[in-house]
């Protein structure tokens, strides 16, 4: 293996470590109602779901993805948050679901900027829209912004529609299957009943599934980082 190849391998290993560290950090932050997991196939694509607990979008269950730049985190390019669910919001582009983050994250600063901060912002704009002043230059859904400013009743009606739509689509399967895609099943007493009962009794549940092979994106039998 040449020196150049060794350098590239080391760079890939360090990048994988940084991505895993970024994901691990989510566990220590207060992100109640937000669930995120990296794609099995692509470490630069993360799947997320937010259960909105308060505010105008309360009871909404919105799916989203986070796309990391190829050189993340050593890149000033900000990761892209795109809602897969329809979200009627002044800062969410109605054509592709991309959330405009330029107000809070004009550029990515390695060591200072973190994914958990982005998720906190997603949570904030859905639960505290009244407390967030949106600069007009950061509006990407003019209809939503105009209704919010001039016809609140109509705005709330549109929001209610997207909340109900998100609930109807909760159990939909992904267009492109991924082993780590966050899926939900309807309540099955035979399957979920014992788990629910143990939670009520505060007892640990016996795990019958095999242990995870970890979050490393190295294909079995290979030693190349990020090879999945």
UniProtKB/Swiss-Prot annotation:
One Pfam short name: UQ_con
| SMART domains registered for this protein in UniProt | UBCc
Q: Which PROSITE patterns match?
A: UBC_2
The family database entries (SUPFAM superfamilies) matched by this protein are listed as: UBC-like (SSF54495)
Which InterPro entries did the record assign? Ub_conjugating_enzyme (IPR050113), UBQ-conjugat_E2_core (IPR000608), UBQ-conjugating_enzyme/RWD (IPR016135)
The chain positions of domain UBC core read: 14-168
- Which Cys pairs are S-S linked? none
Regarding protein family, the annotation reads:
Belongs to the ubiquitin-conjugating enzyme family. FTS subfamily.
Query: Which protein, by its recorded name, is this?
Result: Protein crossbronx homolog
Organism encoding this protein = Anopheles gambiae (African malaria mosquito)
């Amino acid at each position: 293996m040449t020196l150049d190849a060794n350098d590239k391998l080391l760079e890939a290993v360090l990048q994988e470590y940084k991505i895993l560290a970024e994901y691990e950090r989510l566990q220590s932050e207060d992100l109640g109602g937000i669930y995120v997991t990296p794609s099995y196939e692509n470490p630069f694509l993360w799947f997320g779901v937010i259960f909105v607990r308060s505010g105008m979008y309360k009871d909404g269950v919105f799916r989203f993805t986070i796309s990391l730049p190829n050189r993340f985190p050593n890149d000033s390019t900000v990761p892209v948050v795109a809602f897969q669910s329809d979200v009627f919001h002044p800062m969410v582009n109605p054509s592709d679901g991309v959330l405009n983050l330029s107000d809070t994250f004009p550029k990515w600063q390695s060591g200072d900027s973190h994914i958990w901060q982005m998720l906190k912002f997603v949570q904030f704009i859905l639960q505290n829209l009244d407390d967030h002043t949106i600069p007009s230059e950061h509006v990407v859904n003019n209809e939503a912004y105009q209704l919010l400013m001039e016809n609140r009743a109509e705005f709330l009606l549109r929001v209610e529609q997207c909340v109900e739509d998100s609930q109807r689509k909760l159990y939909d399967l992904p267009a492109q299957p991924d082993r780590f895609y966050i899926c939900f099943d309807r309540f099955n007493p035979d399957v979920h009943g014992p788990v629910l009962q143990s939670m009520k009794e505060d007892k640990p549940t016996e795990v019958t599934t095999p242990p995870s092979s970890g979050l490393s994106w190295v294909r079995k039998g290979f030693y190349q980082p990020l090879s999945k």
